[in-house]
Amino acid sequence: MNFETTIGLEVHVELKTNSKIFSPSPVNFGAAPNANTNVIDWGYPGVLPSINKGVVRDGIMAALALHAEVTKKMHFDRKNYFYPDNPKAYQITQSETPIAHDGWVEIEVDGKKKKIGIKEMHIEEDAGKNTHTGSYSYVDLNRQGTPLIEIVSKADIASPEEAVAYLEALRQRIQFTGISDVKMEEGSMRVDTNISVRPYGSDQYGTKTEMKNINSFNFVKNALNFEADRHQKVLMAGGEIVQETRRYDEATKGTVAMRTKEGSDDYRYFPEPDLPPLEVDDAWIEEIRSQMPEMPGERRRRYVNDLGLTDYDAMVLTQTKEMADFFEEAVKDGGDAKKVANYLMNDVNSYLNNQHVDLDDTKLTPANLAGMIKLIDDGTISSKMAKKVFQGILDGQEPAAFAKANGLVQLSDPAELQPIIDAILDDNEQSIEDFKNGKDRAFGFLIGQIMKKTQGKANPKVVNQLLGKSLNER
C-alpha cells in the first residue's frame, strides 16, 4: 500500500521589542536568571496587564509580509494550564480572533514552485523556562511575557523537504521585516510539527502526532522522516496511530512518546477579562504597509536588473538580511557589485561556515571589503596578494594600511621596474635571442625571472608592457 504524508507546522517567532507584551519588563537574551521580571510576570494577585502597541504593530507587519488578511476587531483569550514556568496558571493568547489569517508563502523544491497556505497568526506571551540540575529544579521567568507570533500553516505540506523549504521561506521574510532575528539557536524561532499519513487517494486525514519545540531545520527534517516511516509501518502491520505529543531525540534521530495530545477543551479557553477588545483601522494598517522594508524577491529583481547580477547570485545574497545589507553597503562604498558578490558567496561564506559564525559576529566591514576590491582593480595589490589582505580585513584591518605594512603592495611604477627589467635582460642574452627567433617560452621565462627578483610584487600587466617594449628595442 502506498501512503501520502500530510504535514502542518506551528512556528513561534519571538519579536524583537524592547519590552514584554503585557508588562514593562525589558527583553534581552542572556540576562541573569529572573533579572527581567516584575509583578505582572510573576502573576501577583491584583496586577493588570496592558498591551504593548509595538507588538500589535509587529504582528501586522508580519501579516503583510506573509500575504495575510489582518483582523480588524480582535480580543485575547486565556489558555489555562499549570506548569512551574507559568506562574499565572494561564497563558494570554488569541484563540477565537487571531491577528491575521489566510496568508501564504511560496516555496520551491526540486525545481517545482508551490504556495503553502497560512491558516492564522496569533500574538501571545511566552512562558518561562525550567532548568533541572541534579535533584534541583530552577525556574527562570526572564522569558515569561516575551512577545510571540504563532504562525499556523495549512495542511498543504506534503514532505519533510517541503516543510524545510516552508520554514526557510518563512524565516527569510520575517527576518527581512526586522521584527525578529529568528535565530533558532537562541530560541527566537521554534517549531512544532504535526504529521499524519493516509492511503493515496483517501479523502480522510490520518491520525496525527505532534512534536514540539524542534530547534533546527535539520532536526525538523529528520523528525518528520522518522515519523512518516513509523506511521506507515504501524498501519501496514494493522496497528493504529495514537494521537500524542512526541519528542525528537537528537542522539537516535528518532522520536519518543511524551504524553497523550491535549485538545482545545483541555485548556478551557475563554476571553481574557483583564484586557479590552482590540480594534485596528485601515489607516494604521496602510501606515505600517508604507513602512514595510524591501522583501527578498524585490531585492533579487533589483540586483539582477540594476546591478547586473545573475538570478543565482541574487538568490544566494538574499538568503539572509545581514548578507543582503552587507552587500549593498559594500557596493555603496565603491566595490564592484559582481566582485563583491563573488567574495561574499565564496571567500566570506567559506570563512563563516568554517568558523560556525554569522556575518554580524565577525570584524569584517563592507567598507574594508570594498576597499580591498578597489586595491585589486587599481593594481595596488594582485589577486594572489589579496588572499593575505583578506585575512587582514577579517581581523578588522584597513586594507591599504595592511597591504603596505606587510609588503603586499605591487610594484607598478615604470621608473622602479625598468632598471630591474634591464638587469634581467643583460643577464639573459640567450633568452633575448630565443624570443627574437619566435620562441614564446623565452618571454615567459623572463617574466618569471622578473617576478622572482621582485619577490612576486611586480605588477604583471605593467611588466608585460615594459618587457615587450624593451625586447623590441634590443
From Swiss-Prot:
Keyword presence, Ribosomal protein: no
Reaction catalyzed: L-glutamyl-tRNA(Gln) + L-glutamine + ATP + H2O = L-glutaminyl-tRNA(Gln) + L-glutamate + ADP + phosphate + H(+); L-aspartyl-tRNA(Asn) + L-glutamine + ATP + H2O = L-asparaginyl-tRNA(Asn) + L-glutamate + ADP + phosphate + 2 H(+)
EC number: 6.3.5.-
Disulfide bonds: none
Keyword annotations of the record: ATP-binding, Ligase, Nucleotide-binding, Protein biosynthesis
Entries under InterPro entries matching the protein: Asn/Gln-tRNA_amidoTrfase_suB/E, Asn/Gln-tRNA_Trfase_suB/E_cat, Asn/Gln_amidotransferase, Asn/Gln_tRNA_amidoTrase-B-like, GatB, GatB_C_1, GatB_Yqey_C_2, Gln-tRNA_amidoTrfase_suB_CS
SUPFAM superfamilies: GatB/YqeY motif, Glutamine synthetase/guanido kinase
Domain of life the protein comes from: Bacteria
Gene Ontology biological-process annotations: glutaminyl-tRNAGln biosynthesis via transamidation; translation
Gene3D superfamilies: 1.10.10.410, GatB domain, N-terminal subdomain (1.10.150.380)
GO molecular function: asparaginyl-tRNA synthase (glutamine-hydrolyzing) activity; ATP binding; glutaminyl-tRNA synthase (glutamine-hydrolyzing) activity
Biological role stated in the UniProt entry: Allows the formation of correctly charged Asn-tRNA(Asn) or Gln-tRNA(Gln) through the transamidation of misacylated Asp-tRNA(Asn) or Glu-tRNA(Gln) in organisms which lack either or both of asparaginyl-tRNA or glutaminyl-tRNA synthetases. The reaction takes place in the presence of glutamine and ATP through an activated phospho-Asp-tRNA(Asn) or phospho-Glu-tRNA(Gln).
Record note on quaternary structure: Heterotrimer of A, B and C subunits.
Family membership: Belongs to the GatB/GatE family. GatB subfamily.
The protein's name: Aspartyl/glutamyl-tRNA(Asn/Gln) amidotransferase subunit B
Organism listed in the record: Limosilactobacillus fermentum (strain NBRC 3956 / LMG 18251) (Lactobacillus fermentum)
